[in-house]
Amino acid sequence: KVICHRSSLSFDPLEEMIKLAHKKGISIEAWINPYRISLNKNTYQNFMELSSKKSWLEDTKQSIGYATYKYIFNPESQDVRDYIIAGVKEIVENYEVDGIHFDDYFYIEGTHGETTQGQRMDNVNMLIQDVYQSIKSINSNIVFGISPQGNYENCVNEGADVDTWLKEDGYVDYIMPQVYWSDQYGPDGKTRMFTDRIELYAGLKRQKTVMLYA
């Protein structure tokens, strides 16, 4: 399921990283971009050569193309959800990771089609819930977190329902927004972009069991 260079190596890179990290008392999480298929010609060709799901690129129920060589898995598809969950379980069952971490790409501009914002959030939320439950059913000590976009409005528009993830059980253990801007933002360097974004996230309703990291 995983495209890698393992077959050409005499060792498993992820396994070795976990061993090295744990020896030094460092926790290690597997960072996953759940929906992304390809970003350019090279990654597209790799997917077509190595993936068992290459036929999905010809099926709009399973994938969405939004530019030349750029595809994501269709978040609306149950087959896609099952495939992503199987990949997560493969990691959790075979490696001593301390957590699973999702990147900020869910829907992408150009992939919305006829969906509403609410439908996009519902489709993504089904995956998030199922991933959380799958992880906890295998090992309740493994955490599940997401790094949504630093721009809250973009998150919601692209299907990342951060409000629900923060305030309801069964979605995530933490979120870590990708706030990459400084407090010297803009042409005049006077916009407090980092502080403004962090304060926005900190102001969202959140249950105590869900952590917010910056």
Label each residue range with its predicted role.
Residues 2-10, 67-82, 115-123, 178-189:
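The substrate-binding groove and active-site-proximal loops of carbohydrate-active enzymes
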Residues 78-91, 154-169, 194:
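Short, acidic/polar
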Residues 168-171, 183-214:
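Surface-exposed substrate-engagement region within the catalytic domains
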